[in-house]
């Protein structure tokens, strides 16, 4: 019998879920060498990028549950199915996770007795506990990716317990021994960070407040060269007192900031989106756009947050808490259209107020196999059927991978 050509093997396996690929890697050294090769890793990422998903992280009573759902492919979709991935127990002390290319970074997650930075692939159930940074306890952490060197890096800021605020710590994932190192190029000193980070084309951006007279600036960290820059973002100064509703996003390849507020049109409550787009990166020119969303009875009456912007240019709004029914809204600024998509089975067992969980959503989620190391979360390999806390169906374990 003729052996199967490697090209055909790569093509077949590139269409499988990431968790199944990881399971097949354990069958033999031959399979492992093929499925860990850079050629396959890039092919798998390309396939996954062509079918982006919306990733949900639901936190409830110290337990994290991860789901994903396909992003709409047309303007007429009204509902979408939900895929359950994995869960683990862990409390976040202060800052929520950041997301880059399929990975989540929790700066201070209590998985055991102590809190430590944790990198997690919610789709595959792989995670890695990073060395603790005692002197930077409760500092915000950011995850970035260098598309040229194909490296993920974690940036931990010096704030708030360092006298040398300009010195941050950097860790490169995928190395034999994970260790933090001080950056050689000093970061411009600032009082505190004000937002989560967004990585665009190898540059990590986050909003910060200056020392002295309070003003907003954007801190830029080049993930490859590890150089810092900053530029003025005074357009956000009116939100210094409360930046919780502000999110930095990638809008058609440009750094942008979005927040929202409620308005009133007669007796109806309206939702107004405000978006600042960095139209000229060299001159640091921001252009402001204001949109009043089309009337939607559900959106006008629920708590929601901005999740990001899809590759099609839709601004995604997600309900903040688990409930039934659970909706995601896609607003297209160019067409001034609002698409409501019900995520089926989400929150079916959490109707009671006391059981509601906080939901965080991340757009354009892809399955990425570029970080191979880590431990498998127990819930991903359990041979016991477990009831997903956020839906009415029993989730089946992945029997293809049972190696702890």
Curated annotation (Swiss-Prot):
Residues 1-47 form the F-box domain. InterPro entries: F-box-assoc_dom_typ3 (IPR013187), F-box-assoc_interact_dom (IPR017451), F-box-like_dom_sf (IPR036047), F-box_dom (IPR001810). Gene3D superfamilies: 1.20.1280.50. Pfam families: F-box, FBA_3. This is F-box protein At3g57590.
């Amino acid at each position: 019998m003729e052996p199967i050509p490697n090209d055909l093997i790569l093509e077949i396996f590139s269409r499988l879920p990431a968790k199944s690929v990881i399971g097949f890697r354990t069958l033999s050294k031959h399979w492992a060498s093929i499925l860990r090769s850079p050629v396959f890793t890039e092919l798998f990422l390309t396939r996954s990028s062509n079918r982006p998903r919306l990733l949900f992280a639901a936190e409830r009573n110290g337990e994290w549950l991860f789901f994903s759902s396909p992003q709409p492919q047309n303007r007429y979709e009204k509902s979408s199915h939900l895929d359950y991935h994995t869960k683990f127990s862990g409390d976040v002390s202060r800052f929520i996770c950041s997301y880059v290319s399929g990975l989540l970074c929790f700066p201070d997650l209590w998985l055991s007795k102590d809190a430590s930075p944790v990198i997690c692939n919610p789709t595959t159930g792989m995670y890695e506990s990073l060395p603790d940074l005692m002197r930077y306890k409760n500092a915000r952490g950011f995850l970035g990716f260098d598309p040229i060197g194909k490296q993920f890096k974690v940036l931990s800021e010096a704030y708030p317990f360092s006298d040398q605020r300009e010195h941050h710590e950097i860790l490169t994932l995928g190395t034999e021994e994970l260790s933090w190192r001080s950056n050689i190029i000093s970061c411009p000193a600032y009082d505190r960070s004000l937002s989560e980070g967004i990585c665009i084309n190898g540059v990590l951006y986050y909003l910060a407040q200056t020392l002295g007279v309070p003003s907003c600036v954007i801190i830029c960290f080049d993930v490859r060269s590890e150089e810092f820059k900053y530029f003025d973002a005074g357009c956000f100064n009116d939100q210094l007192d409360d930046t919780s509703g502000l999110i930095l996003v990638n809008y058609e390849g440009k750094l942008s900031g979005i927040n929202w507020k409620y308005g009133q049109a007669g007796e109806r409550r309206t939702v107004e989106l405000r978006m600042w787009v960095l139209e000229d990166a060299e001159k640091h020119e921001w252009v402001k756009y204001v949109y009043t969303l089309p009337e939607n009875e559900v959106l006008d009456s629920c708590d929601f947050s901005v999740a990001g912007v899809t590759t099609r240019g839709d601004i995604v709004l997600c309900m903040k808490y688990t409930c039934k029914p659970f909706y995601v809204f896609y607003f297209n600024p160019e067409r001034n259209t609002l698409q409501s998509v019900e995520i089926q089975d989400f929150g079916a067992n959490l109707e009671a107020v006391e059981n509601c969980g906080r939901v965080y959503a991340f757009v354009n989620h892809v399955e990425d196999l570029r970080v191979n190391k880590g431990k498998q979360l127990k819930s991903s390999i359990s041979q016991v059927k477990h009831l997903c806390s956020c839906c009415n169906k029993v989730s089946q374990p992945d029997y293809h991978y049972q190696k702890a």
